Amino acid sequence: MMAKRLLNHPQGLSSYTARLAAYGDHLVPPVCLLCYSAPDIGHGLCSHCQSALPINRNPCPVCALPHHGPLPCRRCRENPPPYRAIVAPFVYAKPMSQLIRHLKFQHRLELIRPLAELWLEALSPMADLPMRLIPVPMDRRSLRERGFNPAVEIARVIGRNLNIASDVKRVVKVRRTPPQSTLSAKQRTRIRSGVFQSIAPTTEGLIAVVDDVVTSTETARAVADCLCTDNNASVVVWAIARAAVPHDVRR
């Protein structure tokens, strides 16, 4: 019952974990959430682990594919996506991949706030801010199994910091899909159709779709597709990390 109340609370799980972390800091000095040895210098990480985070340098300006810019990659040129651009400041590689895996598969909820803060720190001050955030939804069965949606919790932290509303009900996932790591590129494209559905009219203006990791971009394309059906919205995708190779990530 308590878990259900936390999931349905408007501030989400991250607000509760933040309170617990603040209380715990008075009892035990904070240490790095990754190596557990060195002191935390900010964002939950020690100086060594923070300096080791893989920055997404020179990415494709459209899909954020690492080490490809400054011109759009071949896929974005030949098959332009429905979103304007993906903003993913980190590459999905160690130690960033460890942080995200720990959050998703070990239920390390204390990592939500540090990951969101790292993304916020990397956001360009010149970036156009959206009118609302829409986290990538999970299907009901997957949400029950995991107990929380990382994209929802990350979006809530980002939204509170930027004073942007996070709309968790605008898009729903109506069909369960296999893990992307088990699919080829053609299979990912084939199953994309009809997976997500927008259940409310799309608001005009800029919308940011929020996810933890972008792999093949098929999820980003599918969510943007259903948001842009009326051609009155512009979509960007905000993610913590971008995989250099599509099979790098377990979903």
Locations of the language-model features?
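Glycine-rich phosphate/pyrophosphate-handling loop used in enzymes and phosphotransfer proteins
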Residues: 1-251
